[in-house]
């Protein structure tokens, strides 16, 4: 993978992460989730941290792991009926 392709993948994941965070935030608001220890709030924090790791990633494998976290959060939201 070229450096250009790697940068494009980072950009795509930044957008995907922003979308997941927005969906999780909406879910939290709609369900009046405020406590930081609620599983959805913890999932939000995990996704937030994963999004922050995108630009410091050095390999495609790291980006694949981050994308997997985003996919898990999306699957949760889908099963919860939010998407």
Question: PLM ranges: what are they?
Answer:
Residues 2-6, 10, 36-39, 76-83:
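Short amphipathic alpha-helical interaction elements located at domain edges
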Residues 14, 56, 73:
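Alpha-helical and His/Cys-centered functional microenvironments
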Residues 62-83:
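Amphipathic alpha-helical binding modules
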């Amino acid at each position: 993978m070229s450096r250009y392709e790697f940068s494009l993948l980072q950009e795509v994941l930044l957008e995907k992460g922003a979308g997941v965070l927005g969906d999780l935030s909406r879910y939290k608001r709609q369900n009046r989730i405020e406590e930081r220890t609620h599983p959805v709030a913890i999932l939000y924090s995990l996704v937030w941290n994963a999004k922050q790791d995108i630009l410091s990633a050095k390999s495609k494998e790291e980006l694949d792991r981050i994308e997997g976290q985003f996919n898990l959060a999306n699957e949760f939201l889908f099963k919860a009926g939010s998407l």
